[in-house]
């Protein structure tokens, strides 16, 4: 009979790679070797090249997603597997989620009731509810990051006129003093992107001579200040769309599309320093065959996307509206647009979108980088209980040893 301990390391890694993201924590209790491998499991070689593993919010449902990239660029479509999307059976799926952010293996969810936020560690299965000082508005922006000591924090940015902001500190379990960002505009639909603890936004200078100029703005979670306004390699206009993503934990990526021409460009950073950011154009493509009027840019949303730099492709999530021929009724579908260099275009429908209110729909929001498991404990009560259990076990073990010694002497 084959035992778990008889399985090779390669086979165990293959089994773990097939396990859902949210089941990794349960795997740890199966066997000591599996526990060690799952702890060290970032992304296996096959996954890093062939799959995107992450989270998304679609119609207020919190979902895990595996997007298969292997065979995606074949012209005949053979070898392409549809993305695997499933609901997460956890406390975060017992509520309506409006926004989702990811940083360092932790996921920040903003419920639709606007009274609190919840941070979740999918690997450990821990959640931490954080009450807001006051109910937040639908247009408020959030970000998750950490300081130089790896202490995690949450940024809340609100009031589109004056851009006030406050920071929640996990260590002190409290919100800090209110501050504001003078002279700059950050569109609420453009979510920030977390990279190496800091969060980056696209912004424009208020009352500037060149009103179409776009800047990259960094929020530093160590200083808890906005800094480094660095010009982007493109300009904004009513007919232009721009949004950010990232490439692993090393680079930023920017999507830029002109609605008038249908041209889309993907840019990737080659250098990120405090006073200088350099960009390289990954590829350009004409989107008119797939999207007639360009990606939609609505309140609380812009086309979220992720890229595979090696394959030179991007997967953009947005809405695709179709008008019925018989009843003239518009139906809206969640759609993944797979875009690559040399004009590669493919459209994958994920399902029909739910109407938020009359003729209003919300695009799916996707975390921009593959999920990397974290051992960061975010629930202090659970952590204290676990430490107590360990202490009790140690005491019991010592008592048992003493009893055995007494018996041996007799």
UniProtKB/Swiss-Prot annotation:
Pfam families in UniProt: F-box (PF00646), FBA_1 (PF07734)
Basic and acidic residues compositional bias, start-end: 387-398
InterPro entries on file: F-box-assoc_dom_typ1 (IPR006527), F-box-assoc_interact_dom (IPR017451), F-box-like_dom_sf (IPR036047), F-box_dom (IPR001810), Gal_Oxase/kelch_b-propeller (IPR011043), SCF_F-box_component (IPR050796)
Region (Disordered): 386-410
Domain of life of the organism encoding this protein: Eukaryota
F-box domain sequence ranges: 2-49
Basic residues biased stretches: 399-410
PANTHER family documented for this protein: BNACNNG10540D PROTEIN, F-BOX PROTEIN CPR30-LIKE
Protein name: F-box protein At3g19890
Record organism: Arabidopsis thaliana (Mouse-ear cress)
Taxonomic lineage from the root: Eukaryota, Viridiplantae, Streptophyta, Embryophyta, Tracheophyta
């Amino acid at each position: 009979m084959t035992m778990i301990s008889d399985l090779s390391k390669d086979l165990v890694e293959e089994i773990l790679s097939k396990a859902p993201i949210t089941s990794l924590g349960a795997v740890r209790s199966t066997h000591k070797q599996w526990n060690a491998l799952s702890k060290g499991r970032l992304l296996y070689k096959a996954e890093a090249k062939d799959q995107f593993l992450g989270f998304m919010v679609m119609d207020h449902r919190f979902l895990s997603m595996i997007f298969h990239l292997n065979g995606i660029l074949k012209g005949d479509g053979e070898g392409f597997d549809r993305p695997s999307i499933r609901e997460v059976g956890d406390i975060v799926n017992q509520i309506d989620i409006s926004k989702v952010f990811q940083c360092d293996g932790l996921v920040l969810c903003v419920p639709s009731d606007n009274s609190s936020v919840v941070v979740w560690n999918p690997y450990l299965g821990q959640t931490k509810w954080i009450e807001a000082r006051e109910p937040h508005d639908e247009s408020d922006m959030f970000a998750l990051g950490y300081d130089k000591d790896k202490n995690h924090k949450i940024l809340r940015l609100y009031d589109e006129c004056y851009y006030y902001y406050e920071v929640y500190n996990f260590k002190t379990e409290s919100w800090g003093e209110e501050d504001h960002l003078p002279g700059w505009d950050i569109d609420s639909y453009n979510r920030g992107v977390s990279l190496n603890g800091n969060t980056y936004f696209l912004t424009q200078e208020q009352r500037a001579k060149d009103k179409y100029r776009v800047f990259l703005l960094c929020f530093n979670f160590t200083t808890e200040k906005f800094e480094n306004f660095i010009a982007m390699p493109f300009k904004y206009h009513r007919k232009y769309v721009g949004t950010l993503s990232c490439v692993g934990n090393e680079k930023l990526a920017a999507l830029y599309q002109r609605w008038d021409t249908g041209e889309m460009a993907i840019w990737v950073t080659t250098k990120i320093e405090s006073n200088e950011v350099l960009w390289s154009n990954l590829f350009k493509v004409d989107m008119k065959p797939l999207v007639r009027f360009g990606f939609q840019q609505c309140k609380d949303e812009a086309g979220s996307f992720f890229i595979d730099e090696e394959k030179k492709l991007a997967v953009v999530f947005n809405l695709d509206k179709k008008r019925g021929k018989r009843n003239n009724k518009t139906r809206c579908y969640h759609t993944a647009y797979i875009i690559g260099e040399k004009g590669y275009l493919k459209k994958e429908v994920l399902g029909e979108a739910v109407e938020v209110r009359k003729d209003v729909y919300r695009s799916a929001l996707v975390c921009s980088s593959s999920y990397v498991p974290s051992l960061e404990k975010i629930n202090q009560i659970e952590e204290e209980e676990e430490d107590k259990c360990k202490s009790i076990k140690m005491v019991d073990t010592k008592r048992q040893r003493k009893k055995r010694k007494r018996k041996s002497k007799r």
